[in-house]
Amino acid sequence: MTLTRFVTKNAFRNKRRSLLTVLSIAFSLLLLTFMMTLWHAFSLDEGSAESAQRLVVRHRVSLTFALPGFYREKIRSIPGVVSVVPVSWFGGIYKDQKPENFFAQFGTDPDEFFKTFRDIGMPDDQIKAWQRDRQGVIVDDTLANKYGWKLGDRIMLQGTIYPVNLELNIRGIFHSSPDNKSVYFNTKYVEESVPLFKGQAGTFSILADNPGT
């Protein structure tokens, strides 16, 4: 007797029991779906409508492989692309390697960052200060509150992937929804310190003119 026939035979041996079993499982799944829907509706922040217009381009094999920098202009030439900016993971250590001191760190292009991430809020004077300072960094307000960071403070990120320690000046404190707990600095600072990585990008973030592009 095959397994399928055995299961079918026993399922129809007591039709009432089988029906109640199926109904109880279905009800449990329905209840779980309902609870997850409520939790999603009341607890999660979907972010801005503009975030739906952003795309990320990465290496097709893995995030550990960098993309050539000249891809940026190729992507920019695609119809529907409003702006494109490199975003490269740094993966440095702040203070120590304790999990509570871990946060995301990215190298990017300050001149085009806010053209792509227009839903991130930061005063214009802070944006200009960041763009002027090659060692400038902007930090999420959640991190600023956690560590007591203020404008003008200097922080150091110890390199792990890149053989360089970055000494960064806090030039801006931004707010995003939801909180992204990240910092962004000028990728040219890393390229000048480690020429081997010049002209590469971990990913490209793209802003499309509409979500359907």
Predicted regions and their residues:
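Extracytoplasmic
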Residues: 52-54, 70, 98-103, 132-134, ...
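Diglycine-centered glycine-rich loop/turn motifs
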Residues: 111-138, 144, 150-157
